[in-house]
Amino acid sequence: ELVRTVNALPNQPFVLALDIPSGLDGRTGLAMPEAIRASATVSFAAAKPGLVLPHAHAWTGALHVRAIGIPLAAQRKAPCSFYALDGRSLEPLGHILPDGFKNSYGHVLVLGGAPGLGGAAHLAARAALRAGAGLVTAAAPGAGMADIKNSWPEIMTLPLGATERRWPAALPAELVELLERCAALVVGPGMGRGADAADFIEALLRQPHRPPTVFDADALVLLAGRQDLLDRIAEHDVLTPHPGEAAALLGCSAAEIQADRQESLARLCGLCRGVVVLKGAASLVGQAQSPTLLCPYDVPQLAVGGSGDVLAGCTGGLLARMLPAVMQSHHAAQQNSTAATDISQPVRLQPAHTLAGQAVALHALAGKSLADIWPLRGNTPSDVADALPRTLSAYAAAPAQAAPRIHTRDRKDDILPWPR
């Protein structure tokens, strides 16, 4: 009754919520069934994940997190289970090799773009380049190559049969040779869902020494119900389902996925050893036995067909460019068990988990940057891809450069720590 009375006052008073607005679910960010509409919320040590979800802003108002002196030993014993994907998470991506050349930044192979669906593969390849990959090749049945290249000379192509419209059941020798030279794969954008595509994915997953792979779009649907293939997903692979594709993988409806996204992510992570990105407003990134990364943004400029293909390509680009360095850092951290010093450094994520989270943050912030030009949407996914390097330079300045200028409202400072 008190909550309803305060919320209904004609002249709204300043309401300060401590820890969490009364009546708000700290996990989901939903009222149960009513919650106080705070002008500001001060949470302690680290915010509850529900507080940073976009729909919770109506109840939290301005969100602040402040330290209250929790002992370091206690922080280490009870590390955070959620971490925010904001501008700070991009800072490690600012390192540029002064003596680097194209091979230093990795070769991405995009497998997708069946005839009539080449635009999806083009967007993935374009995004991989914009994310900093040194080389990008797209391979697909030969009849669809022109749409994939789309007048971009930077995208190399490998036609799988000069006039073929179907995916080969066995991997051609030239493709196997290319796999051995690539640092990352992106599989699925515009691939199609026919039996030929299913056979091709099975052959790919049975290929030894397969590079780290991003599975997206049609590839995810073709993996649904194939636990024998999901068992071949490695810890450095990434799955990027939207709610519909997640529903196919779990054998339920998209509405059930959306009803409890955190539980849905946990179930998806239980299907395989890889990293899972559950896309949507406030995307979640998880891996079995690891913390969850939460992207606290709702970006209308990303609500356009092809945006997911851009994310897949961006993820592949970061895997190709950064995975060796991140793996080296991860190994060094494992040798130093005392590296975690406070609540912001309790856990070292697996390298692909870290990079997938950074790709999600980069993609979201690139979309947000387009609001200045297209505040009411109307942008294309190509615009999102082309905004990636500009966004990266704004948030991940190299050490020799000036510190990036980041607005607090974009960073969501101090909400949830980012693991170093």
Where are these regions (language model features)?
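Small-residue (G/A/S/T)-rich helix-start motifs and N-terminal tracts that mark the onset
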Residues: 38-40, 51-214, 221-238, 243-420
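Short acidic catalytic loops
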Residues: 15-24, 185-188, 214-216
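Internal gly/pro-rich beta-alpha loop/helix module
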Residues: 1-79
